[in-house]
A protein has these predicted regions:
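Extracytosolic ligand-binding ectodomains
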Residues: 2-11, 17-20, 24-27, 34-41, ...
């Protein structure tokens, strides 16, 4: 049940004046969302006289498919699933209210599935239920499977959380778009932040997988080509699930590194952090920002596993304490509703819904694949991500341009909200003499580098 549905169910227990106050407050918090609805009215999608009959005769059908992750078997998987479900409810509340005002038949059609085979079966069910586009992908395998599925079925797909550069290059498809920042974007941002702090000598620990090796090569290119004086002073390749042990500790110490980068999943990062911390390593250490590592639950685990190294800096697609660009109210309302900070999975789902919804509304209610894809790839169409800069999808790999955040893990938080401290943003919002796209394209692979065909 949506938030608004629960509110409607309680309406009889409050006074009319109280209800009006609630509605006015809700409208104020949603003010940014009404811009595209006004545009729809002006464009003739919903004639003004039709507003009085909005509930009787929907003027457009906008049904969006969402594949939620299962709760899994670990606390981090459960946290991802909860954030995703809450993000869906948050988006459903906002856009259902907006749609009702102009007579749009709006619905988020959902399935819950994890794993490549399961998510493609779920995607088929969503389309059969009337969804014109599908959102999903909480890891590389799922996003790869859904990208291939979307191409075969000619259904627009938004990748919510998988960062692999392979999906934006050799494995790209014309129907797959990326809400999640790419690995290249994350790594360029981290390199920029650390090098600007005069941490230039890097030791890299990476997993022996296709994705791990690709991340390693891309990060080496970032520090070599973009940052004068930065260099790799050592590297260790580990099998998935393997420990580094005393040999890794000795290698890092001999390398005299300023910074250590762990290119592996959440469990691997926690394991290596603990080993290095126990071995007395003090170099600044960070890990690749997979979705699981952008959660308050991970920050708490990191601080516990490695009291010295585990309270360092991390990159994030979103941070629940951002208080600029309209994000303050947006974050605060989410926290008041769910008693949680707004985290990456919820952020990604909300804005993927918003992207599909706006593309359909601005397209006159035409939800054909050709129309939706044309709107999303049009460089004149800007999407607001609550990040202060209007965003567009890069035409060469359909990656959404956006800024990223640097947070520091709080070793002694007083509550979940304060579990992370926002300390930086890249690219800088205000850079005189530069264009918007130029600023955002500081992060990630440019057209000359793409292998997307």
């Amino acid at each position: 049940m949506t938030i608004m549905a629960r509110a409607r169910g309680r309406r009889s227990s409050v006074q009319a004046s109280d209800w009006e106050t609630v509605v006015h407050q809700s409208f104020a918090l949603r003010a940014r969302g009404f811009v595209f609805l006004l545009a729809a009215l002006l464009a003739g999608l919903v004639p003004g006289s039709a507003l009085l009959k909005a509930q009787e005769a929907p003027t457009a059908v906008i049904h969006i498919g969402l594949i939620l992750p299962t709760a899994g078997t670990t606390p981090l998987q459960a946290a991802i699933a909860k954030s995703a479900a809450d993000g869906m409810t948050y988006a459903e509340d906002d856009f259902q209210l907006n749609a009702e005002l102009v007579g749009i038949d709006f619905k988020i059609v959902k399935e819950t599935a994890s794993g490549a085979a399961a998510v493609t079966a779920a995607a088929d069910k969503l389309v059969a239920a009337g969804a014109f586009g599908v959102m999903g992908g909480f890891n590389y395998a799922e996003a790869k499977a859904l990208g291939d599925w979307s191409k075969a079925k000619n259904v627009p797909f938004i990748n919510l959380a998988a960062s692999s550069d392979l999906l934006r290059n050799q494995q790209c498809t014309p129907t797959m778009f990326h809400m999640a920042p790419s690995a290249a974007m994350y790594m360029d941002a981290l390199a920029g932040w650390y090098v600007r702090s005069n941490l230039r000598q890097w030791y890299i620990v990476y997993e022996d997988t296709d994705e791990g090796r690709a991340q390693y090569e891309r990060f080496r290119a970032s520090i070599r080509d973009r940052h004068f004086g930065a260099r790799e002073v050592g590297a260790t390749r580990l099998a998935v699930g393997a420990s580094g042990g005393t040999s890794l500790v000795s290698a890092v110490r001999r390398a005299n590194a300023d910074a250590i980068f762990l290119l592996m999943g959440a469990e691997g990062q926690l394991r290596i952090l603990a080993e290095l911390d126990k071995g007395g390593i003090t170099a600044q250490t960070t890990g690749f920002p997979y979705p699981e590592t952008q959660l308050r639950e991970f920050y708490e685990m990191s601080a516990k596993a490695a009291p010295t190294l585990g309270v360092g800096h991390c990159a994030a697609a979103w941070e629940g304490t951002i208080d600029a660009y309209g994000a303050r109210e947006w974050n605060a309302r989410y926290s008041s509703l769910f008693n949680e900070p707004l985290q990456m999975p919820a952020w990604s789902i909300y804005h993927a819904v918003k992207t599909f919804y706006e593309s359909a509304v601005f397209g006159g209610g035409d939800t054909s694949a050709a129309n939706i894809i044309a709107h999303m790839t049009n460089q004149d169409n800007v999407f607001d991500l609550h990040k202060g800069l209007g965003s567009t999808f890069r035409p060469w790999d359909r990656q959404l341009r956006q800024s990223l955040y640097l947070v520091k893990i709080n070793a002694n938080p007083k509550d979940r909200i304060s579990g992370a401290i926002l300390v930086g943003e890249l690219p800088a919002i205000y850079m005189p003499g530069t264009e918007l796209v130029e600023r955002l394209d500081q992060l990630g692979d440019m057209q000359r580098q793409t292998k997307c065909k």
